[in-house]
Amino acid sequence: MSPAAAAADGGERRRPPLGGREGRSRARGYGGPAGAAALGLALLGLALYLVPAAAALAWLAVGASAAWWGLSREPRGPRALSSFVRDARRHPRPALTASPPPAKSPVNGSLCEPRSPLGGPDPAELLLMGSYLGKPGPPEPALRQDPRERPGRRPPARSPPPASAVQRVHHVYPALPTPLLRPSRRPPHRDCGPLSSRFVITPRRRYPIQQAQYSLLGALPTVCWNGGHKKAVLSPRNSRMVCSPVTVRIAPPDSKLFRSSMSEQILDTTLSSPSSNAPDPCAKETVLNALKEKKKRTVAEEDQLHLDGQENKRRRHDSGGSGHSAFEPLVANGVPAAFVPKPGSLKRSLASQSSDDHLNKRSRTSSVSSLASACTGGIPSSSRNAITSSYSSTRGISQLWKRSGPTSSPFSSPASSRSQTPERPAKKTREEEPCQQSSSSPPLVTDKESPGEKVTDTTTGKQQSSWTSPPTPGSSGQRKRKIQLLPSRRGDQLTLPPPPELGYSITAEDLDMERKASLQWFNKVLEDKPDDASASATDGPPSTSPPFTFTLPAVGPAASPASLPAPSSNPLLESLKKMQESPAPSSSEPAEAATVAAPSPPKTPSLLAPLVSPLAGPLASTSSDSKPAATFLGLASASSITPLTDSKSSGVSQAEQSVSTPASTASSPTPKPSMLFGMLSPPASSSSLATPAPACASPMFKPIFPATPKSESDSPLPSSSSAATTASSSTAPPTAASTTPTFKPIFDKMEPFTAMPLSTPFSLKQTTATATTTATSAPLFTGLGTATSTVASGTAASASKPVFGFGVTTAASTASSTMTSTSQSVLFGGAPPVTTSSSAPALASIFQFGKPLAPAASAAGTSFSQPLASSTQTAASNSGFSGFGSTLTTSTSAPATTSQPTLTFSNTVTPTFNIPFSSSAKPALPTYPGANSQPTFGATDGATKPALAPSFGSSFTFGNSVASAPSAAPAPATFGSAAQPAFGGLKAAASTFGAPASTQPAFGSTTSVFSFGSATTSGFGAAATAATTTQTTNSGSSSSLFGSSAPSPFTFGGSAAPAGSGGFGLSATPGTSSTSGTFSFGSGQSGTPGTTTSFGSLSQNTLGAPSQGSPFAFSVGSTPESKPVFGGTSTPTFGQSAPAPGVGTTGSSLSFGASSTPAQGFVGVGPFGSAAPSFSIGAGSKTPGARQRLQARRQHTRKK
């Protein structure tokens, strides 16, 4: 400090002498030859720059630097430049030869001495100069001197002649390159002492004396200030600075700012402003300087008013106790001085914006007022962005500020601060009230109205108590605010009042509250529009109700279960009606309802009903057309014993689709999860009775994009509504299976409808697999809705209707005894926790952009494109690519399993496009239990053998592949091969696009058909996992997206372990427990036995079942053969290899951020003996726990 101050002081004093012509004459007097030399050098630089004779790049560089510097200096003193030029022209050589500069300072001497001998050959001098420039050592000291002198000179720059100045100028030419200048300047403050000593040789001796004085003052900037403008202001600053370290830091930027302002006045902005900024030792200072400069520009008058500045400072001093105490509180609070300034600067800008009473505003109230001015309600206003972003992630912060301001006024003894605060706050509160109301945080409004009183009442009250509870923080906050008010305008950084913020701790709760508020706001906006559209569309609510009523009759058959469903069904209808009436509220409700729904089935229906109601609107529209049926919209039935409830789209003529099975199905309303941007309602599993039939209705993502508007297209239905089936199973494990309304066949019209956009489940008929369990998943095309697949009770299989479901994948897992309903919801933000009841997990895969949801028990939610692993028991696994690659797969131990891969792009468990393109609608029902395949587009049906024999149904689905389930796989391949020639595909082995079906590897995928990217697994990045029955038959057919398959000869990106298929980012896992790898952009969550994989992460195989999935191997090769694929076999591509922890399996995933290691802790190599490397861009393989922690950290950072 002292040396820097001294240097600064020296600079200041220099300024006056240099500033006047006296200075010039004086400079010449003591450094006339030096001045001449400097001028000569400048001229040489210009001449060289202009003269082609100096062709060397060094010459050009030197000349250019000199010219640039000279031009930059010009504004200060055009005269000076002209004088330079004139002098140089008159006697360039003498100037060069003159050696007085060396005498003046060793550094200068060193630079200049060579020059004097070289005076003859100017070019040589220039070269030397260039060399010096290149050399950091000598030029830096010179530069150090220069910056100080420059500050001094800047005003004087008008008169460049001073010899010392000239010398520096010489150095400056070389030094001009910013890189040198910056370091040099930074050193100057540090090295002021030695530099000053160097200077001592010449008149600089004065400077040391001044330095001592200023050092006593304790602020370098003060000196600059004094030299430039406001010594008086600086002196108070200095005293303050001396009082508090914070001030010291703040001051230098101020001085620099003042310098810059002076330079601007001088019109020397080009050099001076950069120089002033450059010297700032800390980036913070530079930032502060920029802000201050802006403020000064806006409030130049205020800054220039020394009286006002002094008054403010005086007030601070007068308040003395308050002002100083404010600083003391900072120290007491443990707030670093540096920290305080930053908020101060921001607040200053705010305060500067409101320039009513500088004094009043500057008082702490100003800070409060600035906060208040920024409606810090639900969304922090831009007024204090940085602070609001960090602190007011919770709206409460602004309130705290306000609160602390008013409350502190009583606390703070200083009357001045008090008087100031009430004045500004009252005004601010009035101003802010509307803002806060708009922000939609009533507590905030109340707080602002009566900050002291209401704040305590409102949530801010908590904050206040928390941060006022320490007496020092509260008082300090008040005092600080005062300080901030005064100096902030003056550019005094001393008055930054972070303490209230510091005192207030932002908790996760605050962040959550803020998020919720924002989400609610979004939901209202989004829901109102879609709901309105749906309402308009849903002119035929009765039609929508019929489906429910339909389901209700089904419910009727089961006596006790029926009774349970009946109430729920009524709530559904009622809720649908209500929802139609007021869609917006329902959307907000669904998340809450979904969460609450789990407790009791009746409750669940009611809760679900609101969820469904948004669907109902779209459904109503669809039903009005009667073409689309929201099939099973509300229908999730847990049939006590009955396997699958009849699900029928009421509107659709496809009554056929509904599976009529002993339908004592409780039609539990499927919640339509309304997903507003960030909020996902967790699917509620209602298992009121002992039978744990998890009814997970996953919230559906409310289609934002698709409008429900046209009843004819009825597109909204599929998009908006997904049948999230909640099975409220009153008793037996029997599971309710409901399928969501399916996507209308775009290509092929369903007979019932003419409308192309949506079709209820594509296949006209749902086939019920007699097989003990079948999984049905219906993806919705919109990708907004997730198709919920319900598991039929063990006895009956529910046919699964895949919907096109652009972004959604549904996995249905069924346990023979237990039902699982899986619903996927797409939500951008959070994933709903999935609750699973009983052994059968309900899977909700959510489409989340960001965070993976933690799977409840067995259920895993898919995050962005995260696949769910299904519960261990359920036999059926579906993998869907789901629009962005989220797939949930279920592997079940149930003896009979059906695995239906869903088309990744078009997600279909069962052929989504069953019929379109004349694919035969009838699914080929294998006699084998649970084998139900509906060909879509030419999907080969995978169900070929009884459980043991794995059937590989590979479909060429665009991204879809069917995983064959050994026991029975209905592998509807969408788009692709159909067991039935749909589309003319070969039935058994239909190769779509010429890919051989099943066993033949297509494009290097073994069992899989060519399928564009995937064989059995596929989905664009979805892997269908082959779920194997309880027998551990490795039925998993490996398919490659882009040809990854373990057996596959050629894998585009990776080879999957024979069972595992690497899909784009997905892998299918073979083996009794199949893990599905999905292509999830975000995080893979390792969940219950099935783990979901994040972007490329591979979900681990569940528990002990050996299975390898290598998900996404862009270049991951995981092959038992260990044949290198693209990236090499087990070797990690991109250098990550996941050790195979599990004997049973190694899962490698490509996760961009994290790689998942197999969840199970088996260290052994995979059954095939190869560890699947995961391709992770960023991270080495991490255990799921580590990954979760990582993700948690990331999320926390986001919160901040």
From Swiss-Prot:
Essential component of the nuclear pore complex (NPC). The repeat-containing domain may be involved in anchoring components of the pore complex to the pore membrane. When overexpressed in cells induces the formation of cytoplasmic annulate lamellae (AL). It is a single-pass membrane protein. Proteolytically cleaved by caspase-3 during apoptosis. The modification Phosphoserine is found at residues 83, 244, 319, 322, 325, 345, 355, 367, 370, 408-409, 412-413, 416-417. This is Nuclear envelope pore membrane protein POM 121. It comes from the Eukaryota. Keywords: Endoplasmic reticulum, Membrane, mRNA transport, Nuclear pore complex, Nucleus, Phosphoprotein, Protein transport, Repeat, Translocation, Transmembrane, Transmembrane helix, Transport. It is found in: Nucleus, Nuclear pore complex; Nucleus membrane; Endoplasmic reticulum membrane. Residues 379-397, 640-657, 1100-1121 have a biased composition (Polar residues). Residues 1-56 are annotated as: Cisternal side. Residues 365-374, 404-419, 463-477, 546-574, 581-598, 605-621, 658-669, 681-692, 715-742, 1075-1099 have a biased composition (Low complexity). Belongs to the POM121 family. Residues 10-25, 143-152, 298-312, 424-433, 446-456 have a biased composition (Basic and acidic residues). GO terms for biological process: mRNA transport; nucleocytoplasmic transport; protein transport. Residues 1-29, 91-167, 177-196, 294-328, 345-509, 530-627, 640-692, 706-744, 1075-1151, 1173-1200 are annotated as: Disordered. It comes from Mus musculus. Contains F-X-F-G repeats. The chain crosses the membrane at residues 57-77. Residues 76-1200 are annotated as: Pore side. InterPro entries: Nucleoporin. The gene is Pom121. The record marks D531, D532 as: Cleavage. Residues 1190-1200 have a biased composition (Basic residues). GO terms for cellular component: endoplasmic reticulum membrane; nuclear envelope; nuclear membrane; nuclear pore.
